[in-house]
Regions:
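Short, well-structured hydrophobic secondary-structure segments
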Residues: 78-87
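Bacterial N-terminal signal peptides that target proteins for export
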Residues: 2-13
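Beta-strand residues in well-ordered beta-sheet regions across diverse protein folds
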Residues: 85-86, 95, 135-137
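Intrinsically disordered, low-complexity terminal tails and linkers in eukaryotic proteins, enriched
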Residues: 26-79, 99-202
Length: 202
């Protein structure tokens, strides 16, 4: 009876979290287009129903190694997802090879995907690994990820492939906030690990 009650409580928790994190149907639809790229870290902005990374110019990460906000003047649509660019030149580069410029894990925080959780990301916190773009939810998330880049990439790829890719980002996030992965660490634990690593380098 106790086991069934705990399971029911967790399932109820998922439902509550899902409702709490939806932030409106438009957000859910924006992140979950009918697309091979689903889910993506996108928002709805006017006529652009699935605007990747709030319009960040993805090409600039590769060509300038920095975050640059795109303009509605230069935009493309690829696999039912909308993209903006800071210049016609960047748009042309993207249109020639759009897959090359896609952020890994749909533009969600790469460190969140390590735990099977598609969290939002901060456009100006990123790194490039082997020519691929990884965006993070903030400097703390990036620092935690970089404690073990090979190991965290392996975990992130595992959870992205087996759980996140092709599925609804809101339900996945809610599920993994209740049913945590075996290696789960809280934000406080990760911050402590980062602080310890920095102290050891001094």
């Amino acid at each position: 009876m106790s086991s069934n009650f705990q399971r029911l409580s967790k399932l109820l928790g998922i439902a509550v979290l899902a409702v709490a994190t939806l932030g409106g149907c438009s957000a859910m639809l924006a992140q979950n287009p009918t697309s091979p790229l689903q889910p993506v870290n996108a928002v709805a902005d006017g006529a652009e129903a699935n605007l990747m990374r709030k319009g960040a110019d993805l090409v600039a990460y590769f060509t300038e190694n920095r975050y640059v906000q795109g303009s509605p003047q230069f935009k493309s649509r690829y696999q039912q997802v909308d993209f903006r660019f800071a210049s016609a030149a960047n748009k042309a580069l993207f249109d020639a090879t759009p897959q090359k410029y896609q952020p890994q894990f749909g533009g969600f925080c790469a460190n969140g995907i390590v735990y099977g959780i598609p969290w939002d990301s901060d456009a100006d916190t990123f790194c490039m690994v082997d020519g691929k773009l990884y965006i993070f939810g903030g400097q703390g998330s990036q620092d935690a990820f970089e404690l073990d880049v090979p190991g965290n990439l392996k975990l992130a790829q595992q959870y992205w492939t087996s759980e996140v890719a092709g599925n609804n980002s809101f339900w996945q996030r809610s599920k993994r906030l209740v049913f945590r992965v075996p290696h789960y660490k809280s934000g406080e634990q990760l911050a402590q690990a980062v602080a310890a690593a920095k102290a050891n380098k001094q």
